[in-house]
């Protein structure tokens, strides 16, 4: 009886042993799959409800990363089960090489996706900005698909500003700086940039301008990278745009002949848009540009999103700096025309 059982066991097929290289490859797939799922979870967990208030493209990328991660984990699991069922038929060498190249490219792209998700994590708005998002008797705040609009309630504003936030900065973080402009009678539209990067939609300002046809005098502007893109838009559309408001920013090229009124507001302690960069930008801006220094101000004082890596050390308070930024910004719009009555 025992002899018969032993003979039967000996006749059973033995699953092939996986090579160390194949085992390592499968483990790397598992790590990649986990990373693709974990990165979006980390972004959401560390930013609260920030993602749902940005342009939909950010949520789409996070969702794509989760789906890709689950698919990678499924491939790793199915591959292990197939190995247990026995060896696969050998493929022609050329076909195997092509498959290997395709797999390698796919894995590289997925690694880039996981890294991009981490890098695209927005700087969340802090309490002062969130408090400025409440509508009241003087300003209506409209949170729409492509932007947040600050609309004066007292009469129809005829002068407006389309504003592009800095790279990866929560659009809501601009509220405490932009709302006072609406309280002064100007329409202000803060753009929700795809992925939080203004360069991804350089003509987005045109859509906002078209949505508010009651406004006949427009300025565009922005903070940091947002200001760079706004500068390019103003230079290319100076027949439609009357003013340009730069917050810790400068143009990417020569726009000195553009027919726009420019105001450049900058902080003397800014570690990113440094005073030297502001000085160098003078040659690229119209001769009539008004430069307004915020003594002791830093890059992150132009919105409310906490500290920013690489920034300088402030020599003034955020409240004092923002009061000066608001005053200079209202002055820039005052130069263009009159606010609503």
Task: Annotate the PLM regions.
Residues 23-83:
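Membrane-embedded alpha-helical segments of integral membrane proteins
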Residues 89-121:
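Internal/C-terminal transmembrane anchor helices
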Residues 151-152, 157-167:
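Short beta-strand element of the alpha/beta-hydrolase
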Residues 164, 221-230:
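Gly/Ala-rich beta-loop-alpha elbow adjacent to hydrolase catalytic centers
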Residues 178-198:
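Conserved alpha/beta-hydrolase
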Residues 227-238, 244:
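Short glycine-enriched nucleophile-adjacent loop
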Residues 258, 262-270:
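Short beta-strand/loop motif that positions the catalytic acidic residue
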Residues 273-284:
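Short alpha-helix in the alpha/beta-hydrolase fold that links the catalytic acid
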């Amino acid at each position: 009886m025992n002899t018969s059982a032993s003979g039967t066991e000996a006749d059973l097929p033995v699953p092939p042993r996986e090579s160390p290289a194949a085992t390592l490859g499968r483990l790397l797939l598992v790590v990649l799959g986990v990373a693709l799922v974990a990165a979006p979870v980390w972004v959401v967990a560390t930013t609260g409800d920030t993602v749902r208030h940005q342009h939909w493209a950010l949520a789409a990328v996070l969702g794509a990363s989760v789906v890709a991660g689950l698919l990678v984990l499924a491939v790793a699991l199915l591959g292990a089960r197939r190995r247990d069922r026995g060896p696969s038929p050998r493929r022609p060498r050329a076909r195997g090489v092509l498959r290997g190249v395709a797999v390698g490219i796919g894995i590289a792209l997925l690694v880039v996706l996981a890294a991009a998700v981490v890098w695209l994590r927005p700087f969340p708005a802090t309490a002062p900005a969130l408090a400025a998002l409440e509508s009241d008797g003087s300003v209506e705040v409209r949170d729409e698909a492509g932007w947040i609009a600050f609309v004066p309630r007292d009469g129809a504003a005829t002068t407006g500003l389309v504003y592009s936030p800095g790279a990866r900065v929560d659009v809501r973080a601009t509220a405490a700086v932009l709302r006072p402009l609406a309280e002064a009678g100007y329409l202000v539209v803060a753009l929700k940039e795809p992925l939080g990067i203004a360069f991804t939609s350089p003509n987005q300002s045109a859509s906002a301008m078209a949505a508010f046809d009651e406004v006949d005098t427009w300025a565009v502007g922005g903070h940091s990278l947002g200001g760079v893109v706004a500068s390019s838009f103003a230079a290319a559309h100076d027949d439609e745009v009357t003013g340009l408001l730069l917050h810790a920013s400068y143009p990417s090229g020569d726009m000195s002949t553009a027919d726009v009124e420019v105001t450049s507001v900058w902080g003397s302690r800014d570690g990113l848009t440094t005073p030297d960069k502001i000085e160098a930008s003078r040659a690229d801006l119209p001769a009539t540009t008004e430069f307004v220094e915020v003594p002791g101000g830093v890059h992150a004082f132009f919105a409310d999103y906490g500290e920013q890596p690489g920034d300088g050390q402030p020599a003034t308070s955020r409240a004092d700096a923002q009061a000066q930024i608001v005053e200079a910004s209202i002055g820039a719009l005052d130069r263009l025309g009159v606010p609503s009555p």
